[in-house]
Amino acid sequence: MALAYLLKNYTGRMIVDADGLTLLANMDKTLIKNTKAQLILTPHIKEFSRLTNRSTDEIIAAPVETARSYALEYGVTVLLKGPATVITDGDEVYITDAGCSGMATAGSGDVLSGILAAVCAYLPQEVEKQSGYNGHELAFSVAAGAYINGKAGELAQERNGSISMIASDTVSFTQEVIASLERA
């Protein structure tokens, strides 16, 4: 299986979403614990339920604690998608409510993964130059990517409406969000 091979051999950053999370939920957990890759998992509540073997009600009742516990146990960064998205590496916890109902459409997870890949390729190097992150640059970068994605989605919904919104609408507004952050 390709994912098992990557977990055993890959040493870079790896975003796992959708079907990859289903595969991860069904494989030997020691592969996750022993990987040299920097895993970024981006589940929604049901996917996280399968990963953790906890009920969706348990996760909804304590999303921060559940995500933090899993991240600590497996040495991964978790981005738990929901009305308030939780991002944690087990130590640092970030929460963003950026996003909107129009983003609940096919392809939105792919857009998020693309934004995360771009931000996580660039931002940790910039963050490392600043003090105060103490090895948590990846979690900060994932949180920044989630925020950019959510704000771009909000702009897309504001301008296009939620009913007709498609995933690529979010992409159309990422540059505007990034530019506004650079000006801030």
What are these regions (language model features)?
Residues K81, Y133, N149:
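Adenosine-phosphate binding glycine-rich loop
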Residues R50, T105-Q130, E137-I148:
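Short, small-residue alpha-helix embedded
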Residues I95-G107:
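Short pre-catalytic strand/loop immediately N-terminal to key active-site residues, enriched for Gly-Thr
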Residues M1-D97, E182-R183:
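Glycine-rich phosphate/dinucleotide-binding loop and adjoining beta-alpha-beta core of small-molecule
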Residues G150-A184:
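Charged C-terminal helix
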Residues R54-A62, E126-A143, G161-M165:
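Short, charged, surface-exposed loops that flank catalytic or proteolytic processing sites
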Residues E65-S69, S113-G114, A118, S172:
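Feature representing long, continuous alpha-helical segments
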